[in-house]
Design a protein with these regions (language model features):
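Acidic, polar ligand-binding/catalytic clefts
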Residues: 128-193
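Periplasmic-binding protein-like
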Residues: 172-179, 263-302, 323-342
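Extracytoplasmic small-molecule ligand-binding "clamshell" domains
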Residues: 41-151
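A ligand-binding cleft/hinge motif common to bilobed small-molecule-binding domains
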Residues: 155-162, 211-213, 217-218, 246-282, ...
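Extended ligand-binding regions for polar small-molecule ligands
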Residues: 47-70, 123-124, 205, 283-319, ...
Length: 342
């Protein structure tokens, strides 16, 4: 099953779909293949990190005070501490995915919720953040080879991945229902509320698998759930605004981003409820990912917990409109998607 965001937003504020994709792809391509990107979104050495800078309206820019916590940086592996740098990998190539990770409006700076949490963690650890951009598959090659210390790239915690990697969780892995703001319907965590509805979902995705399971249950109860597919997000959003579908079911970050983009449009959308990407038996989690045995998961988790306890974490999520994916505690290697999932 897919364990990375499987739905990509097609619009950036003030840009046509074609221009937006060209902008993202061009900016990322300008960084080379698997390469470094500019990271100038704050000065951790001076005790601050700027969240949402150059996001083209995807986030609310805010500067957070955060400095090294010596008791946590003391936990770092000796080689990482000596280097003075935290090399952070992002599976952002070729085109990026707002609001998670994408090239900012200056065409060179990596921005997004994933980039920003990596910078915050580096600040707590007293390290200079160095961002490296990869394709999704090559991100893991980078971690395996030691080119990357830790990946912050919307990576789902799975038991399969624990064979090679260690995790520090920092966000819930949620799916969401997007509806017109004028539509009072709510999911409320109950599949029975889908009876009589028409819902769009991406073909071949984890969310489609979940929706098909609900459709089967409803059919057994003599109720109908109509499922539709469209070729791209533009078609999905057109169908939603025209009333052809009642809801779109997809990754929560993508939907949260699109909601911000429609806020001032004639037909704004809203979130009608979320559901764990792992299904009803487990809360899926997004986690910082390091090579197994690297000794990085523990200090990274402690850094995240420091940010949770001191308020920067909540402000980071709020800036990116992702507060509904907050965790109360970062955990090292929490239960992940089981080996037999999907």
């Amino acid at each position: 099953m897919p364990t990375h965001s499987s739905s990509r937003p097609r619009l950036l504020r003030g840009l046509t779909a074609a221009t937006a994709l060209a902008t993202l792809a061009g900016g990322l391509a300008a960084c080379g293949g698997d390469s470094d990107a500019a990271t100038g979104t704050g000065d951790a050495a001076s005790g601050s990190v700027t969240i949402g800078r150059l996001s083209n309206g995807a986030a609310t820019e805010i500067t957070l005070k955060v400095s090294e916590v010596k008791s946590i940086s003391a936990e770092l592996p000796a080689d990482v501490k000596k280097s003075g740098k935290l090399v952070i990998g992002h599976g952002v190539l070729p085109s990026g995915s707002a609001p998670l990770e994408f090239i900012g409006e200056d065409q060179k700076t990596l921005t997004g919720s994933e980039a920003d949490i990596g910078r915050l963690v580096a600040a707590v650890l007293g390290l200079e953040p160095v961002s490296r951009n990869f394709t999704w598959d090559n991100l893991f090659v980078g971690i395996d080879s030691g080119k990357v210390d830790v990946g912050f790239s919307n990576i789902t915690d799975t038991e399969e991945r624990k064979r090679k990697y260690e995790f520090a969780s920092y966000r819930q892995d949620n799916l969401a229902f997007e509806v017109l703001k004028s539509n009072p319907w709510k999911f409320d965590g109950n599949y029975e509320n889908l009876a009589g509805r028409t819902v769009e979902v991406g073909s071949g995705t984890n969310q489609e698998r979940i929706l098909l399971e609900w459709q089967k249950k409803l059919k057994g109860e003599g109720k109908k759930l109509t499922i539709k597919h469209y070729p791209d997000n533009n078609a999905v959003h057109l169908a939603l605004s025209s009333g052809e579908i009642d809801a779109h079911f997809g990754p929560n970050p993508t939907i949260s981003y699109h909601i911000t983009q429609t806020a001032k449009s004639p037909k704004p959308t809203a979130n009608a409820g979320t559901f764990s990407g792992a299904g009803d038996s487990l809360q899926g989690l997004i986690a910082a990912t390091a090579k197994k045995g690297s000794g990085l998961a523990e200090p990274v988790a402690d850094a995240i917990n420091y940010l949770i306890q001191n308020g920067q974490y909540a402000k980071w999520l709020a800036a990116w409109h992702l507060s509904n994916e907050a965790v109360t505690k970062a955990e090292v290697n929490p239960p992940g998607l089981p080996l037999d999932n999907g």
